[in-house]
Amino acid sequence: MNKILLQCDNLCKRYQEGSVQTDVLLNVSFSVGEGEMMAIVGSSGSGKSTLLHLLGGLDTPTSGDVIFNGQPMSKLSSAAKAELRNQKLGFIYQFHHLLPDFTALENVAMPLLIGKKKPAEINSCALEMLKAVGLEHRANHRPSELSGGERQRVAIARALVNNPRLVLADEPTGNLDARNADSIFQLLGELNRLQGTAFLVVTHDLQLAKRMSRQLEMRDGRLTAELSLMGAE
């Protein structure tokens, strides 16, 4: 088994509005190995997106902890979490969240700029990542000049430009048609093989989940046993 990269220990998340308490996550525990491609399947409102926010250090659990590469996130300062997100984690969302006034190349370069890389390194790394997703010829185009599939490829390039250890993906093919969704999954698999990047994808798409190496199911804020998707349509 691969070395554990990320581990969740009894994660709970509760929101409170006045006297009303809502438990969104209940004692969630699992781990992701280095280079693993894993899916968490669940319907809308099951707690999947909340879980990703906790894993990425974007929110704080009510109880429990997230341990990344042996380091508990509860012991990290806000600045240290931000550095971790910039250098070790990548994020892909259902909507691409590209900056509309920037070119594809400039969007991909943004994490490198935040990480204060040298200008020459920023340009070459961003262009190389666009090449890896098959879009070097679109480097100087803005998001409005790209198709939906191309915009999502740019978002993936941006997530991977810092060579993160783990990419957290929230419904990465949710806004794409079947052909583009298949193309995006093939791209994720190729990048996993070439770079050894681990992927944790949360989705309601059983066909996407079926193509990952391991699947878990989330229902009402709880992770169930590993999901069998044999014969899923």
From Swiss-Prot:
Topology term for the membrane: Peripheral membrane protein
BP-aspect Gene Ontology terms: lipoprotein localization to outer membrane; protein localization to outer membrane
Top-level enzyme category: translocase
InterPro entries noted in UniProt: AAA+_ATPase, ABC_transporter-like_ATP-bd, ABC_transporter-like_CS, ABC_transpr_LolD-like, LolD_lipo_ATP-bd, MacB-like_ATP-bd, P-loop_NTPase
Compartments where located: Cell inner membrane
Binding site for ATP: G42, S43, S44, G45, S46, G47, K48, S49
Residues in ABC transporter domain copies: 6-233
Known partners and oligomeric status: The complex is composed of two ATP-binding proteins (LolD) and two transmembrane proteins (LolC and LolE).
Family in the record: Belongs to the ABC transporter superfamily. Lipoprotein translocase (TC 3.A.1.125) family.
Role description: Part of the ABC transporter complex LolCDE involved in the translocation of mature outer membrane-directed lipoproteins, from the inner membrane to the periplasmic chaperone, LolA. Responsible for the formation of the LolA-lipoprotein complex in an ATP-dependent manner.
Protein name, per record: Lipoprotein-releasing system ATP-binding protein LolD
